[in-house]
């Protein structure tokens, strides 16, 4: 099959939600319906079934949250679907942002009892900023939940886009009878069961079929009135408006009971976009170009703790990847020929022979690749839009056993390169390493991973710093003068970019006034010292 045909088959999306909305459950059920797993949580492997929950890191298993990001690929209806699972805790917006730069659509999961929650709003803001098309799944209809019209109004208020229901619930909780497919004009009858795949589902055709009110009484009377209101007042689905981020199709169901999953999977194939062009500083890169390009959007350490490995997650931007092909790392100009390239189903890996635009490949990485690196067949390209945000929280870190100092530095270097934490090395001699984060849980995760993956018992200590700004200047002497005068507040991150550590907003304002030739940046792009606007 040629490159344009393969590109047209691809669908790459992420699931976004607030913790406990059912994201992990829906992830497993999508894999189940696509045939990638036999039962929820078990991979269909050649020799044996293996656990394949997307929550695979040890701390995730203990706490029931997604901290790392997993990649899963499945085939369904002659389409190749790449699912990127995002961190599900409110502290992990930066890592989640990096994942959302690698997808072409998002599936938003909402708990029907709680509505649109804070974490979902933050993720929606990222999607809206990128005009990412969003499909909405309102989950847990088998429980007592809020009125569906109220939920739609709330979604529209937070999203700033029209909702277009593709299905509508008949009843809720113990009275949940099923969902009415508005576009196909039929009702799918609800039956509980965690292993059912829909082959034996019962349908009743027609909103005016007397069988539905006979069986579902008052629940259907309310639902039918709401459906008529939707048909009269709601906007018709417009795929162009959806692709532009102006409409979201809405589905209702119960992921734990495999109900409504089929419709969502079909919508991903029928409505979600194939890979589109990606913008580099030099030019626009189209997915069907003959030559390969790809971007490292994540580096994950210790996916296999037994081997202390690091894997670079690369989204293919164009062309065809072949195992063993000669590639150039645009940042360094160095060549590499990756042979042990893998695809993923959560922690399980398989050797990969080829990949196309929007596929995610894993390249074993021993420090050669960094976040934001661009791989090409020789062209020098710099893709945009993969930033580090200035940390909002800081802690100093020391090792309890001085003999483990080297292991501490190795661990923090690897965790910093994968983006799990930001690590700053003070310019002043003898200063403790500083960790910067956007959420408190990141410190707990790093301490846990240092202990379990690197054998380092680290001590976290409060820091006086409240933020940081990366510093640059067109005048090297002006920059050096500023750094010398503020040596106690200067540190370097994992790519040796200089940063000014701040104790208060007033300190930053004074520095900006005294040193007008120095630029203070609230973000920097991965893979190089390309900085955003002053903030």
From Swiss-Prot:
Q: Where in the cell is it found?
A: Cytoplasm
Tell me the ranges covered by the tr-type G domain, including all copies.
8-278
Any idea which UniProt keywords this protein has?
Cytoplasm, GTP-binding, Nucleotide-binding, Protein biosynthesis
Q: Which GO terms describe its cellular component?
A: cytosol
Any GO molecular function = GTPase activity
Task: Enumerate the InterPro entries for this protein.
Answer: EF-G-like_DII, EFG_III/V, G_TR_CS, P-loop_NTPase, PrfC, RF3_C, RF3_dom_3_sf, RF3_GTP-bd
Chain residues that bind GTP: 17-24, 85-89, 139-142
Any Pfam family from its record, for instance, is EF-G_D2
Which GO biological-process labels does this protein carry?
Answer: regulation of translational termination
Source species, domain of life: Bacteria
The protein's job, in short, is: Increases the formation of ribosomal termination complexes and stimulates activities of RF-1 and RF-2. It binds guanine nucleotides and has strong preference for UGA stop codons. It may interact directly with the ribosome. The stimulation of RF-1 and RF-2 is significantly reduced by GTP and GDP, but not by GMP.
Similarity remark = Belongs to the TRAFAC class translation factor GTPase superfamily. Classic translation factor GTPase family. PrfC subfamily.
Name of this protein: Peptide chain release factor 3
